[in-house]
Amino acid sequence: MYEERPAGLDGAVVWTLTLTEGATARPVLPDGCMDLIWTPGRLLVAGPDTRSHLPDPIPGTRYAGVRFAPGTAPAVLGVPAHELRDLRVDLDDLWGGSRARGLTGRVDEADDPGAALEAVARAAAARARRPDPLVGDIVRRLAAGEPVAAVAAVAGLGTRHLHRRSREAFGYGPKTLARILRLQRALGLVRLGVSYAAAATRSGCADQAHLAREMRALTGMTLSDYRASAKRETPQPSGSSTTA
């Protein structure tokens, strides 16, 4: 069973998952996000994905996560996003063993691991440097389909400078982020019952064939693969949220 709710951090979500016997995990698709994840005895970080990731959760085991809004996790974790791209890393590799073990034990002992993990994330955010102030505007403009050059101009940056800032915040350049956000926008429409053809044009793709190419390039899946996975019984966290 998968559940999520808004977290007490700007744009973040707290999610919990328990996979039942016989349920099949869905592929996790890129969405520009990063996650702090707990499973009994372990805390790890899921970096920003550029391809789909198939988790291998253990039936009956509880999982909890904080999914950070695009570009906000690096300031909290103290690591540039590009260093974690397409990786799952134990938190003790980033914060040191003693600190990570203490936090893991605190979440292990909590009646509500999701709330305890959220408290860990909020405490880390309170101590962290402020996120890049341009991040939110970059995400909003790219999500709206604005060209990268226009986003750079509004931000007062050259395209190379925007690329560097984007790698640090999101894990990849603005063009890749724009493609990922466009794909997620299209799939969100599909989940609402919109046809692939209509979702493609409404999200900014030229047509359904363009959407299919983007789906294959960014996830390794076909649109038919996605339709089949979406019919599986057990929901999974979107984007970087994963269990392993």
Q: Can you say where each PLM-predicted feature lies in the sequence?
A:
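Alpha-helical bundle regulatory/interaction domains
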Residues: 1-150, 155-159, 172-174, 188-191, ...
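A secondary-structure capping/hinge motif
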Residues: 166-172, 214-222
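Enrichment for repetitive, rod-forming helical segments
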Residues: 167, 186-189
